[in-house]
């Protein structure tokens, strides 16, 4: 990769994985992940950067829900790129085309916040329901007029699957996959069906209910690393965007309002 090309590096530090996205000309040209490990060392992360990031960047924006790793990444980015990264969060001031806090400010994970901002800023939509299937399953609604309306947080597919394996003595581990039928006749098939149909009904149920509650139409956007196995089951119209979170982080990073103190 051309080392002279200036780019934006977006990092999403999640509970299960850490996503890295390189933006060039407003497009994602590189998207890779590494497994999250609370014991990650400086040398491990530096080696990962050296192996994968043979380019220069002029900006680095980070969203993190694992604060214990923040300092390592801040130090490595400064050492590697000679710049200080900007950490985005819900409680900073941003210059956006809508007010996310129209319904009042409340504590919100930076990844969820990034999803909701990207849903409004990147699409010509007025009301959006965003479902993110990662370590957690988050389902939040946002409106261009009213801001963030709120949402639900549940455990994600892999958390549920591993919890079942840990607590069912006779159940052996097997690869999860999209179920072919609602009613299956094998144990593994029935587990797959139960695992993914619960999210289908949860997402579709929330989608239909918020339309009744708010008496308006909503668009559904689905994202998250575990979403691909669920998509064939969804029976309402939706947009799938695997890069939604990093796009939102980038928007927020470029929209931070810096206050100068005399």
Swiss-Prot record:
Cofactor note: A monovalent cation. Ammonium or potassium.
Localization (cell): Cytoplasm
Subunit composition and interactions: Homodimer.
Biological processes per GO annotation: coenzyme A biosynthetic process
CC terms in the record's Gene Ontology section: cytoplasm
Stated role: Catalyzes the phosphorylation of pantothenate (Pan), the first step in CoA biosynthesis.
Protein name: Type III pantothenate kinase
Annotated Pfam families: Pan_kinase (PF03309)
Its EC number(s): 2.7.1.33
Superkingdom of the organism of origin: Bacteria
Active site, per annotation: 111 (proton acceptor)
Family the entry assigns: Belongs to the type III pantothenate kinase family.
Catalytic activity: (R)-pantothenate + ATP = (R)-4'-phosphopantothenate + ADP + H(+)
Known pathway: Cofactor biosynthesis; coenzyme A biosynthesis; CoA from (R)-pantothenate: step 1/5
Organism: Borrelia garinii subsp. bavariensis (strain ATCC BAA-2496 / DSM 23469 / PBi)
Molecular function as annotated in GO: ATP binding; metal ion binding; pantothenate kinase activity
Needed cofactors: NH4(+); K(+)
Stretches of the chain forming a coiled coil according to its record: none
Record has Ligase as a keyword: no
Binding site for K(+): 132
Keywords assigned: ATP-binding, Coenzyme A biosynthesis, Cytoplasm, Kinase, Metal-binding, Nucleotide-binding, Potassium, Transferase
Residues holding ATP: 12-19, 135
Residue positions binding substrate: 94, 109-112, 187
SUPFAM superfamilies: Actin-like ATPase domain
């Amino acid at each position: 990769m051309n080392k002279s090309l200036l780019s934006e590096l977006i990092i999403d530090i999640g509970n299960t994985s850490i996503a890295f996205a390189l933006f060039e000309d407003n497009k994602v040209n590189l998207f890779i992940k590494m497994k999250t490990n609370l014991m990650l060392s400086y040398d491990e992360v530096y080696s990962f950067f050296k192996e994968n990031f043979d380019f220069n960047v002029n900006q680095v924006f980070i969203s993190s829900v694992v604060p214990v790793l923040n300092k390592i990444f801040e130090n490595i980015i400064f050492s590697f790129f000679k710049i200080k990264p900007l950490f985005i969060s819900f409680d900073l001031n941003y210059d956006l085309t809508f007010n996310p806090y129209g319904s009042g400010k409340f504590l919100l994970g930076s990844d969820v916040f990034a999803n909701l901002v990207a849903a409004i800023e990147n699409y010509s939509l007025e009301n959006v329901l965003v479902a993110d299937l990662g370590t957690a399953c988050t389902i939040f609604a946002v409106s261009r007029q009213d801001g963030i309306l709120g949402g639900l947080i549940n455990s994600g597919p892999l958390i549920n699957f591993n919890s079942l394996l840990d607590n069912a003595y006779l159940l052996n581990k097997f690869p999860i996959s999209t179920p072919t039928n609602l009613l299956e006749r094998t144990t593994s098939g029935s587990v797959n069906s139960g695992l993914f149909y619960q999210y289908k009904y949860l997402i579709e149920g929330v989608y239909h209910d918020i339309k009744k509650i708010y008496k308006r139409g909503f668009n559904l956007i689905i994202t998250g690393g575990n979403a691909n196995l669920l998509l064939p089951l969804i029976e309402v119209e939706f947009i799938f965007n695997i890069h939604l979170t990093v796009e939102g982080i980038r928007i927020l990073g470029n929209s931070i309002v810096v206050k100068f103190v005399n």
